[in-house]
Amino acid sequence: LFNTPVVPTRAEATNAEGKLELGKIYKHHNPGEKPMPGPLPGMTVSIDDSHVLEKHIAAGVYRGDMRCEAGMVALYHNAGTQMLEYEACKGGVAIPYSLHTNPINIGYPDSLGIGAAVIGDGNTDMVYEMAQTDRKMMKAEGLNIMYGPQVDVTSDPRWPRTSGTYGERPDVTSDIAEALVKGYQDGDNGLNEGSVVLTIKHFPGDAPSENGFEPHVPIGQWRIYRTPGSMEKYHLPPFQRAFDHKVSSIMPDYSRIATDGRAVPQTYRGEITSTEEVPSAYSKELITDLARNKMGFDGYVNSDSGITTVQIYGVENLTEPERYAKAISAGTDVIGGNTDPENIVKAVEDGLLPKADLDRASYNRLLSLFRTKRVDNPYLDPDKADQARVDNFDGAKKKAYEANQKAVVLVKNHEKLLPLAKSQKVCIVTFKGVDSGFAQMAQAMGAGLGNTDEDAALRKTLTEAFEKKGYTVVATPEEADVLYLHVWPISNGLVFNQYAMPVIEMGEIVTDERERNKSQKKTGNKVTVVTLKDVEKIKELADAIHARG
Protein backbone atom coordinates (compact mmCIF):
# COMPACT_ATOMS: atom_id res chain seq x y z
CA LEU A 1 0.00 0.00 0.00
CA PHE A 2 2.94 2.39 0.44
CA ASN A 3 5.37 2.20 -2.46
CA THR A 4 7.65 5.19 -2.98
CA PRO A 5 11.27 5.53 -4.14
CA VAL A 6 13.76 5.76 -1.27
CA VAL A 7 14.98 9.14 -2.54
CA PRO A 8 13.00 11.49 -4.80
CA THR A 9 15.65 12.37 -7.41
CA ARG A 10 18.09 10.52 -9.63
CA ALA A 11 20.87 12.81 -8.44
CA GLU A 12 20.38 11.52 -4.89
CA ALA A 13 20.28 7.93 -6.13
CA THR A 14 23.57 8.28 -8.03
CA ASN A 15 26.85 7.34 -6.31
CA ALA A 16 30.28 8.94 -6.64
CA GLU A 17 31.05 6.76 -9.65
CA GLY A 18 28.02 8.08 -11.50
CA LYS A 19 26.01 4.88 -11.19
CA LEU A 20 22.48 4.50 -9.89
CA GLU A 21 22.17 2.53 -6.66
CA LEU A 22 19.23 0.13 -6.60
CA GLY A 23 18.94 0.45 -2.82
CA LYS A 24 18.18 4.15 -3.20
CA ILE A 25 15.44 3.43 -5.71
CA TYR A 26 13.71 0.37 -4.24
CA LYS A 27 14.30 -0.17 -0.53
CA HIS A 28 16.43 -3.22 0.28
CA HIS A 29 15.14 -5.58 2.95
CA ASN A 30 16.78 -5.28 6.37
CA PRO A 31 15.92 -8.34 8.52
CA GLY A 32 16.72 -6.43 11.71
CA GLU A 33 14.40 -3.53 10.97
CA LYS A 34 11.05 -3.48 12.74
CA PRO A 35 8.23 -2.92 10.23
CA MET A 36 6.47 0.42 10.61
CA PRO A 37 2.73 -0.12 11.16
CA GLY A 38 0.29 1.39 8.71
CA PRO A 39 -2.79 3.48 9.45
CA LEU A 40 -4.99 0.38 9.67
CA PRO A 41 -4.41 -2.87 11.56
CA GLY A 42 -2.43 -5.54 9.77
CA MET A 43 -0.87 -3.11 7.31
CA THR A 44 2.72 -1.92 7.13
CA VAL A 45 4.31 1.06 5.45
CA SER A 46 7.70 -0.68 5.37
CA ILE A 47 7.67 -1.86 1.75
CA ASP A 48 10.95 -3.31 0.48
CA ASP A 49 12.29 -5.73 -2.13
CA SER A 50 11.36 -8.77 -0.03
CA HIS A 51 7.72 -8.16 -0.93
CA VAL A 52 8.62 -8.86 -4.56
CA LEU A 53 11.46 -11.39 -4.24
CA GLU A 54 10.02 -13.48 -1.40
CA LYS A 55 6.28 -12.82 -1.37
CA HIS A 56 6.05 -12.37 -5.17
CA ILE A 57 3.81 -9.32 -4.86
CA ALA A 58 3.46 -7.89 -8.35
CA ALA A 59 1.96 -4.51 -7.49
CA GLY A 60 2.08 -1.58 -5.11
CA VAL A 61 0.44 1.77 -4.43
CA TYR A 62 2.59 4.82 -5.15
CA ARG A 63 2.35 7.55 -2.49
CA GLY A 64 4.90 10.13 -3.62
CA ASP A 65 2.52 12.51 -5.43
CA MET A 66 4.58 15.05 -7.43
CA ARG A 67 7.45 15.11 -4.93
CA CYS A 68 9.41 12.43 -6.78
CA GLU A 69 10.93 13.02 -10.18
CA ALA A 70 8.99 11.23 -12.89
CA GLY A 71 12.17 9.41 -13.89
CA MET A 72 12.58 8.07 -10.36
CA VAL A 73 9.05 6.68 -10.40
CA ALA A 74 9.82 5.02 -13.75
CA LEU A 75 13.00 3.50 -12.29
CA TYR A 76 11.05 2.22 -9.27
CA HIS A 77 8.58 0.60 -11.67
CA ASN A 78 11.44 -0.90 -13.69
CA ALA A 79 13.10 -2.28 -10.55
CA GLY A 80 9.89 -4.03 -9.52
CA THR A 81 9.48 -5.49 -13.01
CA GLN A 82 13.10 -6.65 -13.16
CA MET A 83 12.79 -8.44 -9.82
CA LEU A 84 9.66 -10.20 -11.07
CA GLU A 85 11.46 -11.14 -14.29
CA TYR A 86 14.28 -12.60 -12.20
CA GLU A 87 11.76 -14.70 -10.29
CA ALA A 88 10.08 -15.77 -13.54
CA CYS A 89 13.42 -17.09 -14.81
CA LYS A 90 13.44 -19.41 -11.79
CA GLY A 91 10.05 -20.83 -12.69
CA GLY A 92 7.68 -18.10 -11.54
CA VAL A 93 4.98 -16.39 -13.56
CA ALA A 94 6.06 -13.54 -15.85
CA ILE A 95 3.73 -10.74 -14.75
CA PRO A 96 4.93 -7.12 -15.10
CA TYR A 97 5.00 -4.92 -12.02
CA SER A 98 2.02 -2.59 -11.59
CA LEU A 99 2.07 0.71 -9.75
CA HIS A 100 -1.31 1.98 -8.62
CA THR A 101 -1.97 5.49 -7.38
CA ASN A 102 -4.77 7.50 -5.90
CA PRO A 103 -5.60 10.64 -7.91
CA ILE A 104 -2.69 13.12 -7.87
CA ASN A 105 -3.38 16.84 -8.08
CA ILE A 106 -1.61 18.40 -11.07
CA GLY A 107 -2.68 21.98 -10.37
CA TYR A 108 -6.37 21.76 -11.18
CA PRO A 109 -9.00 22.23 -8.47
CA ASP A 110 -9.69 19.26 -6.23
CA SER A 111 -12.84 17.25 -6.85
CA LEU A 112 -15.39 19.63 -5.32
CA GLY A 113 -13.80 22.48 -7.25
CA ILE A 114 -14.03 20.49 -10.48
CA GLY A 115 -17.72 19.95 -9.76
CA ALA A 116 -18.22 23.66 -9.11
CA ALA A 117 -16.41 24.62 -12.32
CA VAL A 118 -18.54 22.25 -14.39
CA ILE A 119 -21.75 23.55 -12.81
CA GLY A 120 -20.58 27.06 -13.65
CA ASP A 121 -20.55 26.64 -17.42
CA GLY A 122 -21.98 23.16 -17.98
CA ASN A 123 -18.87 22.12 -19.90
CA THR A 124 -16.65 19.11 -19.16
CA ASP A 125 -14.01 19.80 -21.83
CA MET A 126 -11.69 21.01 -19.07
CA VAL A 127 -12.13 17.69 -17.23
CA TYR A 128 -11.29 15.70 -20.36
CA GLU A 129 -8.19 17.84 -21.04
CA MET A 130 -7.02 17.41 -17.45
CA ALA A 131 -7.43 13.63 -17.68
CA GLN A 132 -5.56 13.50 -21.00
CA THR A 133 -2.67 15.54 -19.58
CA ASP A 134 -2.46 13.42 -16.44
CA ARG A 135 -2.74 10.19 -18.44
CA LYS A 136 0.32 10.99 -20.53
CA MET A 137 2.44 11.70 -17.45
CA MET A 138 1.17 8.65 -15.58
CA LYS A 139 1.85 6.26 -18.45
CA ALA A 140 5.38 7.60 -18.93
CA GLU A 141 6.35 7.01 -15.31
CA GLY A 142 4.61 3.66 -14.83
CA LEU A 143 1.52 4.71 -12.89
CA ASN A 144 -0.72 2.41 -14.88
CA ILE A 145 -3.70 2.04 -12.54
CA MET A 146 -5.64 4.74 -10.70
CA TYR A 147 -7.67 4.03 -7.58
CA GLY A 148 -10.23 6.58 -8.65
CA PRO A 149 -12.12 8.63 -9.53
CA GLN A 150 -14.40 8.79 -6.52
CA VAL A 151 -17.86 9.25 -8.03
CA ASP A 152 -19.87 8.92 -4.82
CA VAL A 153 -22.66 11.51 -4.86
CA THR A 154 -22.52 13.25 -1.50
CA SER A 155 -25.75 13.17 0.47
CA ASP A 156 -24.65 14.01 4.02
CA PRO A 157 -22.49 17.10 4.73
CA ARG A 158 -21.05 15.36 7.78
CA TRP A 159 -19.46 12.59 5.71
CA PRO A 160 -15.68 13.17 5.80
CA ARG A 161 -15.08 12.07 2.22
CA THR A 162 -17.37 14.68 0.72
CA SER A 163 -14.26 16.68 -0.22
CA GLY A 164 -13.25 13.85 -2.56
CA THR A 165 -16.55 13.90 -4.45
CA TYR A 166 -17.78 16.11 -7.27
CA GLY A 167 -20.73 17.28 -5.19
CA GLU A 168 -24.36 16.44 -4.63
CA ARG A 169 -25.72 16.44 -8.20
CA PRO A 170 -25.89 13.03 -9.94
CA ASP A 171 -26.10 14.64 -13.39
CA VAL A 172 -22.92 16.68 -12.89
CA THR A 173 -21.01 13.76 -11.39
CA SER A 174 -22.15 11.54 -14.28
CA ASP A 175 -20.94 14.04 -16.88
CA ILE A 176 -17.59 14.29 -15.09
CA ALA A 177 -17.31 10.50 -14.83
CA GLU A 178 -17.81 10.20 -18.60
CA ALA A 179 -15.14 12.82 -19.34
CA LEU A 180 -12.68 11.16 -16.96
CA VAL A 181 -13.17 7.71 -18.49
CA LYS A 182 -12.65 9.07 -22.01
CA GLY A 183 -9.61 11.09 -20.96
CA TYR A 184 -7.77 8.58 -18.79
CA GLN A 185 -8.60 5.49 -20.83
CA ASP A 186 -7.85 7.33 -24.08
CA GLY A 187 -11.29 6.80 -25.57
CA ASP A 188 -14.57 5.15 -24.67
CA ASN A 189 -14.11 1.77 -26.29
CA GLY A 190 -12.34 0.06 -23.41
CA LEU A 191 -8.65 -0.24 -22.68
CA ASN A 192 -5.87 0.24 -25.22
CA GLU A 193 -2.10 0.71 -25.18
CA GLY A 194 -2.42 4.36 -24.15
CA SER A 195 -4.91 3.78 -21.33
CA VAL A 196 -4.60 4.31 -17.62
CA VAL A 197 -6.79 1.73 -15.89
CA LEU A 198 -9.49 3.55 -13.89
CA THR A 199 -10.96 2.01 -10.74
CA ILE A 200 -14.03 4.11 -10.01
CA LYS A 201 -15.28 4.01 -6.46
CA HIS A 202 -17.08 3.24 -4.19
CA PHE A 203 -19.80 1.09 -5.76
CA PRO A 204 -22.79 1.35 -5.24
CA GLY A 205 -22.16 4.76 -3.61
CA ASP A 206 -20.68 5.23 -0.16
CA ALA A 207 -22.12 8.61 0.80
CA PRO A 208 -25.27 7.56 2.71
CA SER A 209 -23.23 6.38 5.71
CA GLU A 210 -25.07 6.44 9.01
CA ASN A 211 -24.67 9.85 10.72
CA GLY A 212 -21.93 10.73 8.25
CA PHE A 213 -19.43 8.34 9.77
CA GLU A 214 -16.79 6.74 7.53
CA PRO A 215 -16.78 2.95 6.97
CA HIS A 216 -13.01 2.48 7.29
CA VAL A 217 -13.92 1.95 10.96
CA PRO A 218 -16.80 0.03 12.55
CA ILE A 219 -18.77 3.06 13.67
CA GLY A 220 -19.41 3.88 10.01
CA GLN A 221 -20.24 0.43 8.67
CA TRP A 222 -23.92 1.02 7.85
CA ARG A 223 -25.46 2.59 4.73
CA ILE A 224 -28.79 4.17 5.58
CA TYR A 225 -31.10 5.08 2.71
CA ARG A 226 -33.78 7.47 3.95
CA THR A 227 -36.09 7.53 0.92
CA PRO A 228 -37.40 5.00 -1.62
CA GLY A 229 -35.39 4.87 -4.85
CA SER A 230 -32.53 7.03 -3.59
CA MET A 231 -29.84 4.51 -4.60
CA GLU A 232 -31.13 4.31 -8.16
CA LYS A 233 -31.88 8.03 -8.48
CA TYR A 234 -28.88 9.61 -6.74
CA HIS A 235 -26.04 7.13 -6.23
CA LEU A 236 -25.98 4.77 -9.22
CA PRO A 237 -26.15 7.19 -12.21
CA PRO A 238 -22.41 8.09 -12.25
CA PHE A 239 -21.50 4.40 -12.18
CA GLN A 240 -23.97 3.66 -14.97
CA ARG A 241 -22.45 6.41 -17.11
CA ALA A 242 -18.96 5.04 -16.49
CA PHE A 243 -20.13 1.51 -17.35
CA ASP A 244 -21.69 2.79 -20.58
CA HIS A 245 -18.28 4.13 -21.59
CA LYS A 246 -16.47 0.92 -20.65
CA VAL A 247 -14.66 1.89 -17.47
CA SER A 248 -12.11 -0.78 -16.72
CA SER A 249 -12.56 -1.43 -12.99
CA ILE A 250 -14.68 -0.66 -9.94
CA MET A 251 -13.96 -0.62 -6.22
CA PRO A 252 -16.85 -1.61 -3.93
CA ASP A 253 -17.37 0.21 -0.65
CA TYR A 254 -16.67 -1.13 2.84
CA SER A 255 -20.15 -0.38 4.14
CA ARG A 256 -23.21 -2.61 4.21
CA ILE A 257 -26.94 -2.08 3.95
CA ALA A 258 -29.11 -2.04 7.06
CA THR A 259 -32.17 -4.30 6.88
CA ASP A 260 -33.44 -3.78 10.43
CA GLY A 261 -35.85 -0.97 9.60
CA ARG A 262 -33.43 1.95 9.86
CA ALA A 263 -33.23 2.21 6.07
CA VAL A 264 -35.74 2.04 3.23
CA PRO A 265 -35.14 -1.03 0.99
CA GLN A 266 -33.64 0.00 -2.35
CA THR A 267 -34.63 -1.18 -5.80
CA TYR A 268 -33.20 -1.03 -9.31
CA ARG A 269 -35.72 -1.16 -12.14
CA GLY A 270 -38.29 -2.44 -9.71
CA GLU A 271 -36.22 -5.22 -8.13
CA ILE A 272 -34.64 -5.23 -4.66
CA THR A 273 -30.90 -4.60 -4.99
CA SER A 274 -29.57 -6.45 -1.95
CA THR A 275 -30.70 -8.15 1.24
CA GLU A 276 -27.47 -9.49 2.79
CA GLU A 277 -25.82 -7.36 5.48
CA VAL A 278 -22.23 -7.65 4.25
CA PRO A 279 -19.77 -5.15 2.71
CA SER A 280 -20.33 -4.66 -1.01
CA ALA A 281 -17.24 -6.67 -2.02
CA TYR A 282 -18.89 -9.72 -0.41
CA SER A 283 -22.30 -9.14 -1.99
CA LYS A 284 -23.08 -11.22 -5.08
CA GLU A 285 -26.37 -9.32 -5.34
CA LEU A 286 -24.50 -6.04 -5.82
CA ILE A 287 -21.35 -7.10 -7.69
CA THR A 288 -22.62 -9.80 -10.05
CA ASP A 289 -26.38 -9.34 -10.22
CA LEU A 290 -26.54 -5.53 -10.17
CA ALA A 291 -23.24 -4.21 -11.57
CA ARG A 292 -22.54 -6.92 -14.16
CA ASN A 293 -25.85 -8.43 -15.14
CA LYS A 294 -28.19 -5.42 -14.86
CA MET A 295 -25.96 -2.37 -15.33
CA GLY A 296 -23.59 -3.90 -17.90
CA PHE A 297 -20.24 -3.52 -16.15
CA ASP A 298 -17.57 -5.47 -18.03
CA GLY A 299 -14.29 -4.86 -16.18
CA TYR A 300 -12.67 -6.29 -13.08
CA VAL A 301 -13.64 -5.71 -9.44
CA ASN A 302 -10.88 -4.50 -7.09
CA SER A 303 -11.78 -4.51 -3.41
CA ASP A 304 -10.68 -1.75 -1.06
CA SER A 305 -7.82 -2.60 1.30
CA GLY A 306 -8.34 -4.80 4.32
CA ILE A 307 -11.71 -6.42 3.66
CA THR A 308 -10.57 -9.83 4.93
CA THR A 309 -8.82 -8.56 8.06
CA VAL A 310 -10.19 -5.18 9.16
CA GLN A 311 -13.50 -4.19 7.55
CA ILE A 312 -15.08 -7.59 8.15
CA TYR A 313 -18.54 -6.31 9.01
CA GLY A 314 -21.02 -9.17 8.91
CA VAL A 315 -18.36 -11.80 8.18
CA GLU A 316 -16.63 -11.73 11.56
CA ASN A 317 -17.46 -15.37 12.20
CA LEU A 318 -15.87 -16.59 8.97
CA THR A 319 -12.25 -17.72 8.79
CA GLU A 320 -9.91 -15.79 6.50
CA PRO A 321 -10.03 -18.50 3.79
CA GLU A 322 -13.83 -18.42 4.02
CA ARG A 323 -13.81 -14.63 3.61
CA TYR A 324 -11.62 -14.85 0.51
CA ALA A 325 -13.89 -17.53 -0.90
CA LYS A 326 -17.05 -15.52 -0.25
CA ALA A 327 -15.66 -12.30 -1.77
CA ILE A 328 -14.24 -13.96 -4.89
CA SER A 329 -17.36 -16.05 -5.48
CA ALA A 330 -19.45 -12.89 -5.09
CA GLY A 331 -17.61 -11.43 -8.08
CA THR A 332 -14.62 -9.61 -6.55
CA ASP A 333 -11.52 -10.26 -8.67
CA VAL A 334 -8.75 -8.50 -6.69
CA ILE A 335 -8.47 -8.38 -2.88
CA GLY A 336 -6.77 -5.08 -2.09
CA GLY A 337 -4.07 -4.50 0.50
CA ASN A 338 -3.41 -8.09 1.55
CA THR A 339 -0.29 -10.16 0.95
CA ASP A 340 -1.45 -13.63 1.96
CA PRO A 341 -2.30 -15.70 -1.14
CA GLU A 342 -1.96 -18.82 0.98
CA ASN A 343 -5.50 -18.16 2.23
CA ILE A 344 -6.79 -18.32 -1.34
CA VAL A 345 -4.91 -21.57 -1.94
CA LYS A 346 -6.36 -23.02 1.25
CA ALA A 347 -9.86 -21.90 0.25
CA VAL A 348 -9.53 -23.84 -3.02
CA GLU A 349 -7.95 -26.90 -1.39
CA ASP A 350 -10.66 -27.02 1.29
CA GLY A 351 -13.44 -26.81 -1.28
CA LEU A 352 -14.58 -23.36 -0.14
CA LEU A 353 -13.72 -21.59 -3.40
CA PRO A 354 -14.59 -23.19 -6.75
CA LYS A 355 -11.60 -23.19 -9.09
CA ALA A 356 -13.82 -21.69 -11.78
CA ASP A 357 -14.40 -18.59 -9.64
CA LEU A 358 -10.67 -18.16 -9.04
CA ASP A 359 -9.97 -18.59 -12.76
CA ARG A 360 -12.56 -15.92 -13.56
CA ALA A 361 -10.95 -13.51 -11.10
CA SER A 362 -7.47 -14.12 -12.51
CA TYR A 363 -8.67 -13.78 -16.10
CA ASN A 364 -10.48 -10.51 -15.45
CA ARG A 365 -7.46 -8.92 -13.78
CA LEU A 366 -4.87 -10.17 -16.28
CA LEU A 367 -6.98 -9.07 -19.23
CA SER A 368 -6.24 -5.41 -18.45
CA LEU A 369 -2.48 -6.10 -18.67
CA PHE A 370 -2.86 -7.57 -22.15
CA ARG A 371 -5.28 -4.92 -23.38
CA THR A 372 -2.83 -2.17 -22.37
CA LYS A 373 0.05 -4.20 -23.93
CA ARG A 374 2.08 -4.08 -20.75
CA VAL A 375 3.14 -7.71 -21.03
CA ASP A 376 4.81 -7.01 -24.39
CA ASN A 377 7.00 -4.11 -23.25
CA PRO A 378 6.92 -3.44 -19.50
CA TYR A 379 10.09 -1.33 -19.14
CA LEU A 380 10.13 2.48 -19.20
CA ASP A 381 12.62 5.17 -20.20
CA PRO A 382 13.20 7.50 -17.19
CA ASP A 383 14.39 10.33 -19.45
CA LYS A 384 11.15 10.17 -21.42
CA ALA A 385 9.21 10.13 -18.14
CA ASP A 386 10.91 13.35 -17.01
CA GLN A 387 10.28 14.95 -20.40
CA ALA A 388 6.62 13.91 -20.37
CA ARG A 389 6.16 15.69 -17.06
CA VAL A 390 7.83 18.84 -18.37
CA ASP A 391 5.79 18.85 -21.58
CA ASN A 392 2.44 18.13 -19.95
CA PHE A 393 2.62 19.60 -16.45
CA ASP A 394 4.13 22.91 -17.54
CA GLY A 395 1.85 23.08 -20.55
CA ALA A 396 -1.24 22.57 -18.41
CA LYS A 397 -0.56 25.39 -15.94
CA LYS A 398 -2.58 28.00 -17.82
CA LYS A 399 -5.58 25.70 -18.22
CA ALA A 400 -5.31 24.61 -14.59
CA TYR A 401 -5.33 28.26 -13.52
CA GLU A 402 -8.42 28.93 -15.63
CA ALA A 403 -10.11 25.90 -14.06
CA ASN A 404 -9.34 27.22 -10.57
CA GLN A 405 -10.86 30.57 -11.51
CA LYS A 406 -14.03 28.81 -12.63
CA ALA A 407 -14.18 26.89 -9.36
CA VAL A 408 -14.01 29.94 -7.06
CA VAL A 409 -16.84 32.34 -6.24
CA LEU A 410 -16.10 35.77 -4.76
CA VAL A 411 -18.66 36.00 -1.97
CA LYS A 412 -17.86 39.50 -0.71
CA ASN A 413 -15.78 42.49 -1.81
CA HIS A 414 -16.33 45.06 0.94
CA GLU A 415 -15.70 48.64 -0.22
CA LYS A 416 -14.10 47.23 -3.39
CA LEU A 417 -10.97 46.13 -1.55
CA LEU A 418 -10.15 43.72 -4.37
CA PRO A 419 -8.06 43.76 -6.41
CA LEU A 420 -5.42 44.84 -3.91
CA ALA A 421 -3.27 47.82 -4.77
CA LYS A 422 0.40 46.93 -5.14
CA SER A 423 1.26 49.72 -2.69
CA GLN A 424 -0.58 47.98 0.16
CA LYS A 425 1.38 46.08 2.79
CA VAL A 426 0.08 42.59 3.53
CA CYS A 427 0.32 40.55 6.74
CA ILE A 428 -0.34 36.83 6.37
CA VAL A 429 -1.88 34.82 9.21
CA THR A 430 -2.60 31.11 8.77
CA PHE A 431 -4.98 28.91 10.70
CA LYS A 432 -4.05 25.29 10.14
CA GLY A 433 -3.30 22.94 12.98
CA VAL A 434 -1.97 19.43 13.39
CA ASP A 435 -3.89 16.78 11.47
CA SER A 436 -2.84 13.50 13.05
CA GLY A 437 -4.44 11.46 10.29
CA PHE A 438 -2.58 13.39 7.60
CA ALA A 439 0.65 13.17 9.57
CA GLN A 440 0.31 9.40 9.72
CA MET A 441 -0.17 9.22 5.97
CA ALA A 442 2.69 11.65 5.32
CA GLN A 443 5.02 9.51 7.38
CA ALA A 444 3.92 6.48 5.40
CA MET A 445 4.53 8.29 2.13
CA GLY A 446 8.08 9.10 3.11
CA ALA A 447 7.41 12.82 3.24
CA GLY A 448 9.12 13.11 6.60
CA LEU A 449 6.47 15.46 7.90
CA GLY A 450 5.59 13.58 11.05
CA ASN A 451 3.02 15.01 13.45
CA THR A 452 3.97 18.65 12.88
CA ASP A 453 2.25 22.00 12.63
CA GLU A 454 2.24 23.06 8.99
CA ASP A 455 1.65 26.77 9.58
CA ALA A 456 5.27 27.78 9.00
CA ALA A 457 5.52 26.02 5.65
CA LEU A 458 2.14 27.39 4.60
CA ARG A 459 3.11 30.96 5.50
CA LYS A 460 6.34 30.59 3.53
CA THR A 461 4.47 29.43 0.44
CA LEU A 462 1.94 32.26 0.69
CA THR A 463 4.63 34.87 1.32
CA GLU A 464 6.50 33.80 -1.80
CA ALA A 465 3.27 33.94 -3.81
CA PHE A 466 2.45 37.49 -2.66
CA GLU A 467 5.99 38.75 -3.17
CA LYS A 468 6.12 37.24 -6.65
CA LYS A 469 3.10 39.40 -7.50
CA GLY A 470 4.90 42.51 -6.25
CA TYR A 471 3.33 42.94 -2.80
CA THR A 472 5.24 43.84 0.36
CA VAL A 473 4.70 41.25 3.10
CA VAL A 474 5.10 42.45 6.69
CA ALA A 475 5.40 40.44 9.89
CA THR A 476 2.70 41.96 12.11
CA PRO A 477 -0.86 43.28 11.69
CA GLU A 478 0.28 46.59 13.16
CA GLU A 479 2.46 47.21 10.10
CA ALA A 480 -0.13 46.10 7.57
CA ASP A 481 -2.73 47.77 5.39
CA VAL A 482 -4.34 44.41 4.62
CA LEU A 483 -4.62 41.25 6.70
CA TYR A 484 -4.74 37.99 4.72
CA LEU A 485 -6.28 35.16 6.77
CA HIS A 486 -5.71 31.69 5.34
CA VAL A 487 -8.34 29.51 7.02
CA TRP A 488 -7.89 25.76 6.53
CA PRO A 489 -10.12 23.46 8.62
CA ILE A 490 -8.85 19.98 9.36
CA SER A 491 -10.74 16.88 10.38
CA ASN A 492 -8.53 15.53 13.13
CA GLY A 493 -7.57 12.39 11.24
CA LEU A 494 -11.28 11.74 11.02
CA VAL A 495 -11.19 8.67 8.81
CA PHE A 496 -9.19 6.78 11.38
CA ASN A 497 -10.15 8.52 14.63
CA GLN A 498 -13.82 9.49 14.33
CA TYR A 499 -13.46 12.06 17.09
CA ALA A 500 -15.38 14.84 15.38
CA MET A 501 -17.33 15.69 12.28
CA PRO A 502 -15.46 17.61 9.56
CA VAL A 503 -17.14 20.96 10.14
CA ILE A 504 -15.71 24.23 11.36
CA GLU A 505 -16.17 24.31 15.12
CA MET A 506 -15.91 27.62 16.92
CA GLY A 507 -13.26 26.67 19.43
CA GLU A 508 -12.17 23.47 21.08
CA ILE A 509 -14.38 20.44 21.61
CA VAL A 510 -13.95 17.96 24.43
CA THR A 511 -15.27 14.58 23.38
CA ASP A 512 -15.05 10.90 24.26
CA GLU A 513 -11.93 9.11 23.11
CA ARG A 514 -12.50 5.95 21.08
CA GLU A 515 -10.27 3.02 20.23
CA ARG A 516 -8.52 4.03 17.03
CA ASN A 517 -8.75 1.67 14.04
CA LYS A 518 -10.43 -1.00 16.16
CA SER A 519 -13.84 -1.33 17.73
CA GLN A 520 -14.36 2.44 18.16
CA LYS A 521 -15.54 1.68 21.69
CA LYS A 522 -15.18 4.51 24.18
CA THR A 523 -12.03 4.23 26.29
CA GLY A 524 -13.31 6.29 29.21
CA ASN A 525 -10.88 9.11 28.48
CA LYS A 526 -11.60 12.54 27.08
CA VAL A 527 -9.78 14.18 24.17
CA THR A 528 -9.72 17.75 22.96
CA VAL A 529 -10.10 18.33 19.25
CA VAL A 530 -10.46 21.40 17.07
CA THR A 531 -11.04 21.62 13.36
CA LEU A 532 -9.96 25.25 13.07
CA LYS A 533 -6.86 26.24 15.00
CA ASP A 534 -6.99 29.51 17.01
CA VAL A 535 -10.39 30.41 15.57
CA GLU A 536 -11.02 32.78 18.48
CA LYS A 537 -8.21 35.05 17.24
CA ILE A 538 -9.92 35.87 13.95
CA LYS A 539 -12.28 38.49 15.40
CA GLU A 540 -9.48 40.04 17.43
CA LEU A 541 -7.30 40.37 14.34
CA ALA A 542 -10.17 41.69 12.23
CA ASP A 543 -11.04 44.35 14.81
CA ALA A 544 -7.40 45.44 14.99
CA ILE A 545 -6.96 45.88 11.24
CA HIS A 546 -10.34 47.58 10.82
CA ALA A 547 -9.45 50.04 13.58
CA ARG A 548 -6.54 51.16 11.41
CA GLY A 549 -8.93 51.87 8.57
Predicted regions and their residues:
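Glycoside hydrolase catalytic-domain context in secreted enzymes
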Residues: 1-549
